[in-house]
């Protein structure tokens, strides 16, 4: 596996490229000369977009890592556990109950409904006698489809479907200074995940084993789901859904570094940020001057890698 410093060395030049790629003209020479238009574009759009990409990519990748540990299944993530759909339902509820609600209130509703959905998903898993590698995420995707269908039905009845369009896919083109800072809430949550990483490792061993080791399993499970829900809710409200990210990145890292969360956490965050940044830059240049959303590119890349992971697991299992 690529060492941490190599991931950073890949991330830095790609971040520099990201700052200077886009429809608006901005150059290093212009910044050096103090061109006010270049600096305005830098502070208003390019830097906020870069920061949002890095934080969202790192956050969602780590969410997948925690979900996989708590569910004891390699293919569980916010995408395959229906958490994105729950977050969108939370946003819809906030729009219905409080039409003039601020983004902070919408985020609060998104986090609350995501947490309830995550707890419901884990409760469903607890009733399953056979936790097959593929069957568990299939259950999660069915659960998410039910939530999504319910959300769409309510939105249609309330004539609010158009209001939800912005949260259906991840898109960083609308990120501007003063409209994205809420995503920074993910940073202290990531720090908390690192602090409690060992507890999540023990929880991933199963309730009986973890309890015998002195761990309060239910408390740790709730804490993990809460932290995942906060990041998921914040990212959904700020930039929208980015499919498969939390599924493929932890799997790619664990192939080489194992399942110790504390050991793989930084690699997972860096690789997630790097992958989203690459997809964003590619989306900006592939049909320039138009843009392809990150969620579309990530959906294609993620589905291919997901299929490869499935085939690889079955090949080695046989």
Residue ranges with predicted function:
Residues 1-318:
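Alpha-helical transmembrane segments in inner-membrane proteins
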